[in-house]
């Protein structure tokens, strides 16, 4: 047996679904996310309805949703996705990160509403990193020691001026 192979540790690659009607933004987010070898975009959608269909088919760990999309907005898509993927961590990454949007997102399964403005990409990467770290801990722990697989709740995320926590 190859010693290098025997000591190799399986690393779970975080599967991320990205839904935004702006193709240039999707391309930028994809490039930034895939710089991390632990993460990969498993699918992209330009509208909410396609996001729901892809989530059902691809079973992502993280779903990034824009608020304003054709056919179905991000909050409506999150309600549907959460009904069949309760363990997926969902984030609303939007230019509309207002208190009104946070109120609409309440109870949808969305863990955070992040603004695209300012350091939006850094906040998004921080969210994914936190989910990735917690997911990796669940996959690498012995079966009796694995952490809960609940979705992120509002107490899991720090809130800043451009990161609004939501309550369930």
Language-model features: locations:
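Receiver (REC) domain active-site loop signature in two-component systems and cognate sites
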Residues: 69
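Alpha4 helix (beta4-alpha4-beta5 surface) of REC/receiver domains from two-component response regulators
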Residues: 76, 97-126, 130
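Conserved acidic segment of CheY-like receiver
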Residues: 12-25, 29-33
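Non-catalytic signal-transmission and effector/linker regions of two-component phosphorelay proteins
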Residues: 1-15, 122-168
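Short amphipathic alpha-helix used as the core "switch/output" element in two-component signaling
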Residues: 53, 75-86
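Acidic catalytic/metal-coordinating carboxylates
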Residues: 47-50, 72-76
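Active-site beta3 strand of CheY-like receiver
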Residues: 58-64
């Amino acid at each position: 047996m190859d010693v290098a192979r025997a000591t190799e540790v399986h690393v779970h690659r975080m599967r991320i679904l990205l839904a935004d009607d702006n193709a240039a933004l999707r391309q930028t987010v994809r490039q930034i996310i895939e710089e991390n070898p632990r993460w990969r975009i498993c699918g992209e959608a330009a509208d909410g309805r396609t996001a729901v269909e892809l989530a059902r088919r691809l079973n992502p760990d993280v779903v990034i949703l824009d608020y304003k999309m054709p056919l179905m907005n991000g909050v409506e898509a999150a309600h549907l996705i959460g009904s069949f993927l309760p363990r997926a961590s969902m984030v609303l990454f939007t230019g509309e990160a207002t208190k009104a949007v946070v109120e609409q997102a309440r109870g949808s399964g969305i863990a955070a509403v992040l603004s695209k403005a300012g350091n939006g990409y850094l906040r998004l990467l921080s969210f994914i990193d936190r989910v990735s770290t917690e997911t990796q801990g669940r996959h690498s722990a012995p079966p009796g020691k694995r952490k809960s697989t609940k979705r992120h709740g509002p107490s899991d995320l720090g809130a800043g001026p451009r990161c609004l926590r939501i309550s369930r």
